């Protein structure tokens, strides 16, 4: 016996049955889907349906709620203002407001309805006196601005 004379035993490799390929194929016409209805159509899946068992969405408890009155802030660090000042997008002489930050590209314009809060992340040698008129400030940010000789309006 040589390598080119090897072959599988009869019935060792069974071809899989191709579904919905003619009536004579044994799985033709409806292709095991039954007759009519949502589940017989192509591309249809019932979202969240798990075959009759209680879906995970119903098994898990409801938790929490979305408070309507929470204030949503755009967060700006002192460092972001420092970079904008260095690039010339903001001026030290001007009062820095929400609108000026949007023009300078520090705050995203899409979130124009949100309030602006200043946080204290800045370089160690921050000493620029700034005049700011924003919606909120962290306590550390207030300290940094006041130590540098700035004003919060």
From Swiss-Prot:
Belongs to the universal ribosomal protein uL15 family. InterPro entries: Ribosomal_uL15, Ribosomal_uL15/eL18, Ribosomal_uL15/eL18_sf, Ribosomal_uL15_bac-type. The lineage of its organism: Bacteria, Pseudomonadati, Pseudomonadota, Alphaproteobacteria, Rickettsiales. Gene3D superfamilies: 3.100.10.10. Keywords: Ribonucleoprotein, Ribosomal protein, RNA-binding, rRNA-binding. This is Large ribosomal subunit protein uL15. GO terms for biological process: translation. One of its GO terms (molecular function) is structural constituent of ribosome. GO terms for cellular component: large ribosomal subunit. Residues 21-40 are annotated as: Disordered. Binds to the 23S rRNA. The gene is rplO. Residues 23-35 have a biased composition (Gly residues). Part of the 50S ribosomal subunit. SUPFAM superfamilies: Ribosomal proteins L15p and L18e (SSF52080).
């Amino acid at each position: 016996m040589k390598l080119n004379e090897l072959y599988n035993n009869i019935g060792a490799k069974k071809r899989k049955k191709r579904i919905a390929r003619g009536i004579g194929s044994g799985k033709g016409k409806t292709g095991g889907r039954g007759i009519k209805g949502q589940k017989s159509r192509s591309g249809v899946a019932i979202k969240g349906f798990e075959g009759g068992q209680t879906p995970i969405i119903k098994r898990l408890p409801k938790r929490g709620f979305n408070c309507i009155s929470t204030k949503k802030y755009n967060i700006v660090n002192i460092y972001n203002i420092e970079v904008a000042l260095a690039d010339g997008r903001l001026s030290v002489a001007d009062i820095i407001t929400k609108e000026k930050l949007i023009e300078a590209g520090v705050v995203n314009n899409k979130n124009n309805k949100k309030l602006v809060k200043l946080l204290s992340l800045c370089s160690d040698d921050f000493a620029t006196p700034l005049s700011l008129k924003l919606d909120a400030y962290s306590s550390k940010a207030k300290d940094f601005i006041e130590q540098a000789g700035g004003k919060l309006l």
